[in-house]
Amino acid sequence: MDVPALVEQAREGRPRAVARLISLVEGASPQLREVMAALAPLTGGAYVVGLTGAPGVGKSTSTSALVGAYRTAGRRVGVLAVDPSSPFSGGALLGDRVRMSEHASDPGVYIRSMATRGHLGGLAWAAPQAIRVLDAAGCDVILVETVGVGQSEVEIAAQADTSVVLLAPGRGDGIQAAKAGILEIGDVYVVNKADRDGADATARELNHMLSLGESRAAGDWRPPIVKTVAARGEGIDEVVEALDKHRAWMEKHGVLAERRRARASHEIETIAVTALRERIGDLAGDQRLSALAAKVADGELDPYTASDELVAGLTGR
């Protein structure tokens, strides 16, 4: 496969090329390294927004509404909808365009579902690479919608420039969000389904929780709370405005560059740990491991020292 040609086609906005590149990184193709090397100098221009929240708060509807708002403003949009994996096929349960079919024919929108494959953080393990593909393909904004199953969703903060936490009235979402720890990661909070009873109370509860223990210095970002009815498009422009303000604030204070460096560090660590696991997995039956195991079993060596020796042998340190 001609990777440079495929990357060039993706830069031109050809959906099939984008899809092929994402499939290559998602499937851990032997050409993965070549693909990532070709993409690296083409990335950094897209604004990555993560959307998370409990099931039923309207994440998909909100994502679709945001896509519409960004397209009206002339921005190219990429969407990664991270879905639960099917225990039978290992694929995403929901199709790429099932929930956002109104945008399927828009050449300025690329939508892709990715399976979590059991990853505890809710994000597909290949999501960071897929974000790079969409970035290189010229997307101005990339929306990453995660599974939303509780505490594990905190990982979205490691992948997004801005994290949006969605809640809905009458669900005790404020309390649940506090328990799950996602109140600590939100840059913008959205109370969706605001036409229902209890929306104002939910917003007040959320505001109270955010203010508890708050000790922000002058000029620090204070997460806004926006009420929406995404199904009717109400409040979506206000969400976009809040996102634009947060991006401007981050750029002014150097926070955006700092977050992206942290994201790159997290990605490097993940790749390195995965590589070490694979090398350790290859040691089954290896004489070094067998010899160390025998010493530990005989009480000649403790398992921590044995582990240090094993790692030193793998890394050459």
Feature map (PLM): residue ranges:
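Canonical P-loop GTPase G-domain recognition
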Residues: 188, 194-249
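Nucleotide-state-sensitive switch-loop elements of NTP-binding domains
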Residues: 2-49, 54-57, 63-152, 156-174
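Long, well-ordered amphipathic alpha-helical subdomains in the mid-to-C-terminal portions
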Residues: 227-230, 238-315
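Short hinge/gating elements
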Residues: 4-7, 114, 189-191, 224-229, ...
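Generic secondary-structure signature for well-ordered alpha-helical cores
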Residues: 12, 23-30, 41, 72, ...
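Flexible active-site lid/hinge loop adjacent to a nucleotide/diphosphate
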Residues: 169-197
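Generic beta-sheet signal
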Residues: 80, 166, 191-192, 228
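Alpha-helical scaffold elements adjacent to nucleotide-binding pockets in ATP/GTP-utilizing enzyme cores
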Residues: 93, 130, 155, 159, ...
